[in-house]
Each structure stands twice: as structure tokens, then as C-alpha cells.
């Protein structure tokens, strides 16, 4: 849940047996420390709607950490401070994703199932049709925080990062 979601917390809280909500602070740049005011405002809104505030969807991991750049020490310290602040606010679970560049990949957010319900889905064939640098690079859920020039530069930086190097950078 976020304040800009089409389904408002007022409606989510009306779902039978709904006890908690997964949310995040969305107005702070990746790598920066989330303000206690933002965290507490999110907690207040959640609790006011009768929901538990115990799970955060993501504290994004800055690309400089994944790439092993010199700025990673400051960014890791900021990440740790976010974890401390969330713990102080009562958060027990922080979901994270260390996937380079796009955070997560789905090709559709509403794949129709046999029973008429919908779910998130990934189809490699759909993904392979896209060219994120020279053509279309929008997939459901991507925040599109990179301009094409920035994306091209980031892809070039990752060309020199093997799977082992990425894991070394994450273990650092």
C-alpha cells in the first residue's frame, strides 16, 4: 500500500479478516535515510485504519552498493539506519530485493486465471521482445526512475560485474 495506490487504505481495511498491510515510504530517494516523521505518519495512518504496522515492502538497495562503488559505505550506513528506525517503529519484517537495476520483473500485473481471478505473472517471451535501452523499457511495476541515458550507463557498469562479483558486493 502507498498513498498513491488506486485502492485506498479505507477500502483495504474493510476486507474481512484483513489484519495487516505491507507498505513503504515512497517519497525518499533511494539510499537516503527515511525520516522518523515519514515512518511514524505511515504507522499512524495504518493503525488508524485498524491494521498492524509490522511489514515494510522494501528499503531499496542503492545500485552503488550492488556495483561496489566507493559510496557504498555511506549508503550501507543509511540502510542500517533505516532498519533501526523501522525496528523502533515496530516493524518486524523488511522485504528486500538485491536484483540489479529493475528491482523486480513481471510482464503483467493482472493475468487472468481459470477461476476469473488475476495474479502477477512473468513471461520470458514478452520480456525478450523489449529493448530497455533503445526501445520500450516499461514493464508493470517498474518505477521508471532512470532516463534512457542513465539506464544505458547503468547497464554498461553492470557489464563488468559478474555474478560472483555481485555477490561479493552484497556480502560486503
Q: Which residues are covered by each model-predicted region?
A:
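Active-site beta-loop-alpha junctions enriched in small/polar residues
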Residues: 1-3, 23-28, 58-61, 98-101
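Short, acidic/polar
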Residues: 2-15, 42, 74-84
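Conserved, mostly hydrophobic/aromatic
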Residues: 12, 21-23, 46, 86, ...
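Structural preference for beta-strand elements that scaffold enzyme active sites
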Residues: 19-22, 50-55, 92-95
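An N-terminal, globular interaction/scaffold subdomain
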Residues: 35-54, 58, 75
Amino acid at each position: 500500500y502507498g498513498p498513491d495506490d488506486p485502492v485506498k487504505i479505507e477500502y483495504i481495511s474493510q476486507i474481512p479478516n484483513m489484519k495487516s498491510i505491507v507498505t513503504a515510504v515512497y517519497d525518499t530517494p533511494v539510499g537516503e535515510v527515511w525520516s522518523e516523521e515519514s515512518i511514524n505518519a505511515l504507522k499512524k495512518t495504518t493503525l488508524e485504519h485498524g491494521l498492524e504496522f509490522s511489514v515494510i515492502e522494501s528499503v531499496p538497495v542503492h545500485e552503488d552498493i550492488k556495483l561496489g562503488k566507493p559510496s557504498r559505505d555511506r549508503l550501507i550506513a543509511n540502510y542500517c539506519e533505516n532498519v533501526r528506525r523501522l525496528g523502533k517503529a515496530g516493524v518486524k519484517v523488511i522485504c528486500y530485493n538485491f536484483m540489479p537495476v529493475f528491482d523486480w520483473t513481471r510482464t503483467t500485473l493482472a493475468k487472468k486465471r481459470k477461476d476469473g481471478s488475476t495474479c502477477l505473472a512473468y513471461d520470458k517471451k514478452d520480456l525478450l521482445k523489449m529493448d530497455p535501452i533503445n526501445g520500450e523499457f516499461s514493464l508493470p511495476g517498474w518505477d521508471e526512475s532512470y532516463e534512457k541515458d542513465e539506464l544505458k550507463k547503468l547497464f554498461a557498469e553492470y557489464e563488468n560485474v559478474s555474478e560472483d562479483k555481485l555477490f561479493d558486493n552484497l556480502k560486503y
